[in-house]
């Protein structure tokens, strides 16, 4: 792995001169294709949790960006659409059906998944868009018209509801993508962006918008936090009243309750939100 990282780092330093040496470019393209395939298989990830902290593998982001630089756009076709892109689809008409059967993946018409994404077992993909570098773990549902940004990380047994936007990020290199940990529910038409981390078991109501500067308020205590939804929190949209009379309030999100793991497993989402 260290030699692979070294090759990417060296190529990154001369990314503006890559086309000046054709033999090195051929070697680099093979390496980049291998990395993209490793992303497809989930053996390499853009972001990993180590000792309770999420860390970005910047060299993987660099590899993806180098892949864009060194790959020419081409025309792609399927039975009902055509497009012109540098990034191939992960699945095509030539994909062996046994790949889907063995992994128990269900992908319906209108779902766009770019290569360089990991789709684990028992994932259901409704008409949606999943960008390069994303990681979708086992048993998760990506519902209709959801968008999963580049490098976003989605955990096990999550439900990403219809029309939801999960932000990704390739640049700046050190920036984390949005991370949705295991067993989370993200309500319809919500938007989670700018590297926000939604910790395990959290429930996000419909129509909640969270970025890095969004105030996240504990209703019981008034404490304000940013950039992180604590584990097993139940979150709804809210308004923080202005201190001065007659001034407009500002949007915020409110943690209305926190439940333990056992309660989260037993109680329906609708009951938690009520």
UniProtKB/Swiss-Prot annotation:
It is found in: Cytoplasm. Its EC number is 2.3.1.117. Pathway: Amino-acid biosynthesis; L-lysine biosynthesis via DAP pathway; LL-2,6-diaminopimelate from (S)-tetrahydrodipicolinate (succinylase route): step 1/3. One of its GO terms (molecular function) is 2,3,4,5-tetrahydropyridine-2,6-dicarboxylate N-succinyltransferase activity. Keywords: Acyltransferase, Amino-acid biosynthesis, Cytoplasm, Diaminopimelate biosynthesis, Lysine biosynthesis, Repeat, Transferase. GO terms for biological process: diaminopimelate biosynthetic process; lysine biosynthetic process via diaminopimelate. GO terms for cellular component: cytoplasm. Homotrimer. Belongs to the transferase hexapeptide repeat family. HAMAP family: DapD. This is 2,3,4,5-tetrahydropyridine-2,6-dicarboxylate N-succinyltransferase. The gene is dapD.
